């Protein structure tokens, strides 16, 4: 069960959705924000790009980096609740994890390694209800 007020960040390499759990006895997710590469500042590529990395892969790594920078800034300015769930595909999580600030890490109560950015709030709630 997720605590009321938990923020749920659902991401892939090209977009992210932020939900807040408004449920008390069951999970009820309300969409708070949609994030796209165009809605984030351009921080540039996520470190040195391997020669074999395609422009698409580089864009996905950059978006993941920008998303974590936004979440870190929210955590440091106390604009994140004490409980955050991250749902992202394994590749995006691989880009994101090393960039988590300690203040964001402290708030992350769960991670799901799934591609669910196009899933309904009901499907997300069902996935979060499983142990």
Where are these regions (language model features)?
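Terminal alpha-helical anchor/extension segments at protein ends
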Residues: 1-131
């Amino acid at each position: 069960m997720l605590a009321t007020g938990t923020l749920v960040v659902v991401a892939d390499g090209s977009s992210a959705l932020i939900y807040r759990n408004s449920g008390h006895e069951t999970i009820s997710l309300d969409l708070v924000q949609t994030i796209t590469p165009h809605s984030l500042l351009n921080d540039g590529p996520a470190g040195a790009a391997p020669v074999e990395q395609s422009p698409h892969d580089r864009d996905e790594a950059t978006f993941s980096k920008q998303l974590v920078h936004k979440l870190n800034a929210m955590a440091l300015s106390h604009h994140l609740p004490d409980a955050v769930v991250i749902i992202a595909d394994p590749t995006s999580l691989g880009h994101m994890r090393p960039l988590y600030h300690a203040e964001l890490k402290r708030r992350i109560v769960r991670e799901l390694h799934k591609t669910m950015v196009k899933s309904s709030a009901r499907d997300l709630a069902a996935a979060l209800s499983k142990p």
